[in-house]
């Protein structure tokens, strides 16, 4: 059956089919060929789940996160808004169908900025959005969120006109994807579990990804070293041990023969995770005792551990392993691609190349649409100047004409924005206003002339310059 060709196969899918069938259909009331059911009902459901669960290669967002970004752009959310209220606004404006609680969690996730969360959060949280030690945020009615200062630098409003629009029951909703100035799917990472597919992408450094973009724009290709996973503030190590396989280690130092101090945990461990681990190790006789010196005010870990005598004789690497300070993660690069299809990428580099090519395509569209916009503005300013100047110089006499005759006169002189021109207030038909109109026209023509020199490379470079400036000192 063709369904297994695009949602995977195996015992997990057989169980999914069983659950779907008995949750959605009463056996005595519904009869259908198994192959028809699998190729239609189940396949549609599976694809919908996957589209909700997997990040998009272009903007790194799942469907719900994109709805939040869409509403933030639409509302120009520059002032903090209660998370519970923002969730309600997203539901109203983007046809979100899965309830407030789930959406509030999405908003919180977009704002979290501790080590192991977002390397570049899209929203700025006001209140307790969780920390690395204690990730649980406060209730949504007590915390607020707004756009980050660099939000519109990542999602340039000039690109909005070129986004692929979507509609639900006649209402416009979020676009299929955005084309941010940075590859957010690699910078912030992402996870997702769908039907027959899963995704696990680790975060990368913002600075490294900017370096990769700048070098790629210059035609340089040997950039694999910049795709190493990295989290802001992480003091441990990340070592490649296989294809897309990484060994993430915390930090441990000896304090005498049988004592060690742990000052960093491997991502994504939390304080609570490691406290449970230490109790298990103590019960198993691997360690004798431990004390917790972690500091919640600085979100830093500190554990002093007394080892069992036999454990103390081992090497540092063996002790690190026994104390669960080494975590192995294999990345799985499954994303929704630009064609809205599920695609399993082989590496972070392949994801970047797909993102880069589509982004360049949309920068060319930006140049075309901005050139068209500026040309229209020049045309409007030119007509305004010609009209006011004509009235001032007496070439266009308006005082003894009715509106219909005036419109005919303007048409004969090649004017097009007639309604706007005939609605100008009388005080604008003066010599000084004519000069102001000429100055505005000259400025706009110069702006258009300069913009005609732009290329996708120069536009992207300007975006990166602005983002780097906004991120300084962050």
Report residues per predicted region:
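Charged, surface-exposed alpha-helical interface/stalk elements
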Residues: 219-474
């Amino acid at each position: 059956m063709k369904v297994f060709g695009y949602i995977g196969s195996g015992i997990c899918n057989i169980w999914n089919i069983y659950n779907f069938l008995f949750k959605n259909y009463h056996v005595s009331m519904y009869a259908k060929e198994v192959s028809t059911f699998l190729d239609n009902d189940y396949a549609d459901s599976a694809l919908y789940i996957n589209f909700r669960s997997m990040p998009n290669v272009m903007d790194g967002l799942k469907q719900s996160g994109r709805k939040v970004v869409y509403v933030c752009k639409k509302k120009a959310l520059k002032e903090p808004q209660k998370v519970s209220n923002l969730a309600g606004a997203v539901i109203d404006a983007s046809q979100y169908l899965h309830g407030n609680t789930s959406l509030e969690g999405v908003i919180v996730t977009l704002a979290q900025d501790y080590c192991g969360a977002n390397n570049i959060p899209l929203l700025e949280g006001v209140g307790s959005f969780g920390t690395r030690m204690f990730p649980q945020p406060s209730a949504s009615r007590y915390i607020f969120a707004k756009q980050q200062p660099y939000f519109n630098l990542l999602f340039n409003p000039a690109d909005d006109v070129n986004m692929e629009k979507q509609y639900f029951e006649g209402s416009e909703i979020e676009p299929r994807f955005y084309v941010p100035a940075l590859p957010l799917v690699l910078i912030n990472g992402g996870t997702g579990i769908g039907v027959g597919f899963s995704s696990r992408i680790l975060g990368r450094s913002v600075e490294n990804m900017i370096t990769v973009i700048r070098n790629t724009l210059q035609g340089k290709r040997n950039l694999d070293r910049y795709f190493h996973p990295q989290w802001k503030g992480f003091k441990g190590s990340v070592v490649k041990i296989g294809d897309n396989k990484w060994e993430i280690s915390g930090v441990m130092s000896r304090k005498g023969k049988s004592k060690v101090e742990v000052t960093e945990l491997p991502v994504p461990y939390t304080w609570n995770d490691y406290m449970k681990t230490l109790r298990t190790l103590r019960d198993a006789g691997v360690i004798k005792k431990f004390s917790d010196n972690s500091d919640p005010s600085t979100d830093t870990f500190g554990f002093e551990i007394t080892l069992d005598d036999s454990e103390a004789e081992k090497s540092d690497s063996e002790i690190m392993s026994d104390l669960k300070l080494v975590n192995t993660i294999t990345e799985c690069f499954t994303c929704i691609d630009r064609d809205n299809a599920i695609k399993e990428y082989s590496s972070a580099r392949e994801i970047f190349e797909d993102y880069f090519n589509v982004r360049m395509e949309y920068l060319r569209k930006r140049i075309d649409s901005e050139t068209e916009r500026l040309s229209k503005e020049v045309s409007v300013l030119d007509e305004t100047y010609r009209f006011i100047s004509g009235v001032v110089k007496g070439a266009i006499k308006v005082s003894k004409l009715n509106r219909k005759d005036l419109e005919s006169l303007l048409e004969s002189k090649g004017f097009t924005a007639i309604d706007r021109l005939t609605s100008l207030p009388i005080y604008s038909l003066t010599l000084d206003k004519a000069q102001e109109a000429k100055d505005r026209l000259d400025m706009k023509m110069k702006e258009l002339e300069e913009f005609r020199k732009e290329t996708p490379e120069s536009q992207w470079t300007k975006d990166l310059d602005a983002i780097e400036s906004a991120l300084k000192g962050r």
